[in-house]
Amino acid sequence: MKVLVINCGSSSLKYQLIDSVTEQALAVGLCERIGIDGRLTHKSADGEKVVLEDALPNHEVAIKNVIAALMNENYGVIKSLDEINAVGHRVVHGGEKFAHSVVINDEVLNAIEECNDLAPLHNPANLIGINACKSIMPNVPMVAVFDTAFHQTMPKEAYLYGIPFEYYDKYKVRRYGFHGTSHSYVSKRATTLAGLDVNNSKVIVCHLGNGASISAVKNGESVDTSMGLTPLEGLIMGTRSGDLDPAIIDFVAKKENLSLDEVMNILNKKSGVLGMSGVSSDFRDIEAAANEGNEHAKEALAVFAYRVAKYVGSYIVAMNGVDAVVFTAGLGENDKNIRAAVSSHLEFLGVSLDAEKNSQRGKELIISNPDSKVKIMVIPTNEELAICREVVELV
């Protein structure tokens, strides 16, 4: 079976065509600047990268161009649209309606739309991508895979906020969590790599990228996670503040004469390590600045690592123990300094890091010493493959 995996943003569209038998990506690509001038970058598994500058006025045109690239006689990987057996769509927010992936029908589309208030930047774009694919491939089964679904196993004590219960009743204000597809894939892979029984395991997954979140996965189920109603809660991130005193919003708004929307924009797009360091949202730039003596850059890195470690500690309490701590996503997979800084806070647990193994980038391996009481691991995430597997199970 060939599965087309679509991740649709407001002005971009990532895709992979995956052979579900070999679990290999036959082609990967990205449509950028949709609605502006348009650019499609396409690469087949054994071919050169192709960059096509072409107008992409909307997502339907972008999907048509993706199909054309996949079928191109020079760099394509299929000869007919009929070779695409199913399409898997990443959907950011499923609210409480979706605890699992589902085959898309009109009822599902309506339910996704009802969650738009919870993810106004993402869900509408996800729906546009789904509808564009449906118009081009009306007879191909489509599956929605939700970022929030994996975390629907959290108990109430983990997802309820200390606010009037009526807001949960009326508006479903609660912790939802995100990056669920990644947390699910990585936690399962971790139990295999560590030789653990998934039904008797306690794994903490640190998904550290420009967006970052941590989850506590007990016996294969998410029991807590750092992101909340929105992806703004939790860890300090590239541009997001993460946890803070809510009164700061009112305080800054009054001091700076800003509207609520302006303050929220600052917390989402101008805070995190970017705001703290004054350098960049890219940890490579911040580390370079820190090495040159920039104190704000040093502080941003130290606070980031401390916050990660503090969450790890709290999730050990949530699960009454831990077997493995796993680093994944761009930063977690590639930044040895961040992994070492976080792990240094965990030495009281008997954590012992192998410096040579930790120096490797982007490889799946155990980076703790054999005598470490908790396994520390690096597992590259593969959300597209995880979505493909969900699709195969349902169709």
UniProtKB/Swiss-Prot annotation:
Domain of life, per lineage: Bacteria
Amino-acid positions noted as binding ATP in the UniProt annotation, renumbered to this chain: K14, H207, L208, G209, N210, G211, D282, F283, R284, G330, L331, G332, E333, N334
Cofactor requirements of the protein: Mg(2+); Mn(2+)
EC code: 2.7.2.1
Recorded metabolic or biological pathway in which this protein acts: Metabolic intermediate biosynthesis; acetyl-CoA biosynthesis; acetyl-CoA from acetate: step 1/2
Function statement: Catalyzes the formation of acetyl phosphate from acetate and ATP. Can also catalyze the reverse reaction.
Entry-linked Gene3D superfamilies: 3.30.420.40
Binding site for substrate: R90
HAMAP family the record matches: Acetate_kinase (MF_00020)
List of residues binding Mg(2+): N7, E383
Gene: ackA
UniProt GO BP: acetate metabolic process; acetyl-CoA biosynthetic process
Family named by the database record: Belongs to the acetokinase family.
PANTHER family: ACETATE KINASE, ACETATE KINASE-RELATED
SUPFAM superfamilies: Actin-like ATPase domain
Name of the molecule in the record: Acetate kinase
Database matches in InterPro entries: Ac/propionate_kinase (IPR004372), Aliphatic_acid_kin_short-chain (IPR000890), Aliphatic_acid_kinase_CS (IPR023865), ATPase_NBD (IPR043129)
GO cellular component: cytoplasm
Active-site positions on this chain: D147
GO molecular function: acetate kinase activity; ATP binding; magnesium ion binding
Organism: Lachnoclostridium phytofermentans (strain ATCC 700394 / DSM 18823 / ISDg) (Clostridium phytofermentans)
Subunit architecture: Homodimer.
Cofactor binding, per record: Mg(2+). Can also accept Mn(2+).
Residues the record marks as site: Transition state stabilizer: H179, R240
Keyword entries, A-Z: ATP-binding, Cytoplasm, Kinase, Magnesium, Metal-binding, Nucleotide-binding, Transferase
Catalytic activity, reaction form: acetate + ATP = acetyl phosphate + ADP
Cited PROSITE patterns: ACETATE_KINASE_1 (PS01075), ACETATE_KINASE_2 (PS01076)
UniProt subcellular location: Cytoplasm
